C-alpha cells in the first residue's frame, strides 16, 4: 500500500507546473499520504535533494509561473547505474511511487524507472503540446496567450511600416502552438514542421498577397525549420518589402498560468493520486475529449503518435 510519494518537474518548464505540484500535494495529503518534493528534476533525485512537503509548501503557488521545485537537464539519467542511485535515494526515505511532470523526455525517465520496478505516473507539462496521449499539455494555453499577444504587437508596427514580420514560435517538432497562434493572431502565412516547406513557395504566396493590395503580413513559423533571419533577408530580396524576423524564445515559457492551465494541472495532479491509490504505475495522464484519461507510459512513448490536424490548417488558410 502506498504511503509516501515523490513529485518532480523535469525538462523545459511550463506555466501551470506549480499548480500541478499543488494538485499532487494537496490531493495526496487529503488521502493521508506523505508527499516529498524532489528539487531540480532527475538531477536532484540523483543528488538526493528531497524534502517533505506540507499543504503550506504549495500555498500561493497556483498562480505562479515556472516551477518552485526547479528543473534541470540531466542526460546521465539514461545510465542504469545513475537511475539505481536515484531509486536508492527514494527507497531509503520510504517512497513508494513518483509523479513526474514534464514532456516526452521526462516520460522516458519515468518509463525507465518503472521498468526497474519503481512505479511512476507522468503528467504532461510542456508548452509544445507534443506529448502523446493527451489533447492538451499543461502550459500550452498560457504560452498561446503569450504568443498571440506578441503577434498583436507585431501587427501594430508591421501595419505602420507596411512591413513583413516573421515570428518564430516554440514547439520543437510540433506545430500546434504555431498553428493556434496564427489563427488567433490572424497571421497571413503559417509554416509548420508537419508540412514540407520551400521558401520560394512562401515568397510566391506573399507576392500574390501584395498583388491583391496587401500592404503588410505576418508569417508564423515553428522553430528549427530554418534560420528565420536568413529567411527574412530572402523574402526582402525577392519581394522588395522590408522584412523583419522576431524570435520569441523563452518568454513563451514564463508568466502567470491562465485559468485553463491551472484547472488542467490541478485536476491532473489530483488524478495521479487516484491512480496510485488504485494500484496503477507506469501510466501517463492526459485529457481527451474533455475527460481525464491514462495510458501505459511505454505505449505512449513508443507507439502513440499525436495526429496532425491538417483539417484545421486547411480551414486556417481560408481565413487569410
Curated annotation (Swiss-Prot):
Family: Belongs to the phosphofructokinase type A (PFKA) family. ATP-dependent PFK group I subfamily. Prokaryotic clade 'B1' sub-subfamily.
NCBIfam families per record: PFKA_ATP, PRK03202.1
Pathway membership, UniProt: Carbohydrate degradation; glycolysis; D-glyceraldehyde 3-phosphate and glycerone phosphate from D-glucose: step 3/4
Keywords: Allosteric enzyme, ATP-binding, Cytoplasm, Glycolysis, Kinase, Magnesium, Metal-binding, Nucleotide-binding, Transferase
Described purpose of this protein according to its UniProt entry: Catalyzes the phosphorylation of D-fructose 6-phosphate to fructose 1,6-bisphosphate by ATP, the first committing step of glycolysis.
Entries under PROSITE patterns matching the protein: PHOSPHOFRUCTOKINASE
Cofactor section: Mg(2+)
UniProt-annotated location(s): Cytoplasm
GO-annotated cellular components: 6-phosphofructokinase complex
CDD domains, per the entry: Bacterial_PFK
Sequence positions that bind substrate: 126-128, 163, 170-172, 223, 244, 250-253
GO function term, MF aspect, one: AMP binding
GO aspect biological process, one term: fructose 6-phosphate metabolic process
Binding site for ATP: 12, 73-74, 103-106
Highest taxon above the source species: Bacteria
Subunit record text: Homotetramer.
The protein's Enzyme Commission number: 2.7.1.11
Gene name, Swiss-Prot/TrEMBL: pfkA
UniProt key word Nucleus: no
Pfam families referenced in this protein's UniProt entry, alphabetically: PFK
Record field: catalytic activity: beta-D-fructose 6-phosphate + ATP = beta-D-fructose 1,6-bisphosphate + ADP + H(+)
Regulation: Allosterically activated by ADP and other diphosphonucleosides, and allosterically inhibited by phosphoenolpyruvate.
Protein name as catalogued: ATP-dependent 6-phosphofructokinase
Amino acid at each position: 500500500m502506498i504511503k509516501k510519494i515523490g513529485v518532480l518537474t523535469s525538462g523545459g518548464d511550463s506555466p501551470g507546473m506549480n499548480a500541478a505540484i499543488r494538485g499532487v500535494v494537496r490531493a495526496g495529503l487529503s488521502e493521508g499520504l506523505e508527499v516529498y518534493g524532489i528539487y531540480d528534476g532527475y538531477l536532484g533525485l540523483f543528488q538526493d535533494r528531497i524534502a517533505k512537503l506540507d499543504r503550506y509548501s504549495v500555498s500561493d503557488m497556483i498562480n505562479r509561473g515556472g516551477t518552485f521545485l526547479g528543473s534541470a537537464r540531466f542526460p546521465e539519467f539514461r545510465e542504469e547505474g545513475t537511475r539505481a542511485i536515484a531509486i536508492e535515494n527514494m527507497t531509503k526515505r520510504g517512497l513508494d511511487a513518483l509523479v513526474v511532470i514534464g514532456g516526452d523526455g521526462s516520460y522516458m525517465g519515468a518509463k525507465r524507472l518503472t521498468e526497474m520496478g519503481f512505479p511512476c505516473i507522468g503528467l504532461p507539462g510542456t508548452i509544445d503540446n507534443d506529448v502523446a496521449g493527451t489533447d492538451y499539455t499543461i502550459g500550452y494555453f498560457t504560452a498561446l496567450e503569450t504568443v498571440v499577444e506578441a503577434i498583436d504587437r507585431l501587427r501594430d508596427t508591421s501595419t505602420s511600416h507596411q512591413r513583413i514580420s516573421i515570428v518564430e514560435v516554440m514547439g520543437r517538432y510540433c506545430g500546434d502552438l504555431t498553428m493556434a497562434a496564427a489563427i488567433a493572431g490572424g497571421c497571413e502565412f503559417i509554416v509548420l514542421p508537419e508540412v514540407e516547406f520551400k521558401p520560394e513557395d512562401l515568397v510566391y504566396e506573399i507576392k500574390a498577397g501584395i498583388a491583391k493590395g496587401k500592404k503588410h503580413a505576418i508569417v508564423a513559423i515553428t522553430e528549427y525549420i530554418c534560420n528565420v533571419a536568413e529567411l527574412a533577408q530572402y523574402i526582402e530580396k525577392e519581394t522588395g518589402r522590408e522584412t523583419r524576423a522576431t524570435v520569441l524564445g523563452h518568454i513563451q515559457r514564463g508568466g502567470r498560468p491562465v485559468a485553463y492551465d491551472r484547472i488542467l494541472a490541478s485536476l491532473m495532479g489530483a488524478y495521479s493520486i487516484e491512480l496510485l491509490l488504485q494500484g496503477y504505475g507506469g501510466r501517463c495522464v492526459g485529457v481527451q475529449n474533455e475527460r481525464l484519461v491514462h495510458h501505459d507510459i511505454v505505449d505512449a512513448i513508443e507507439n502513440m503518435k499525436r495526429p496532425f490536424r491538417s483539417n484545421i490548417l486547411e480551414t486556417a488558410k481560408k481565413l487569410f
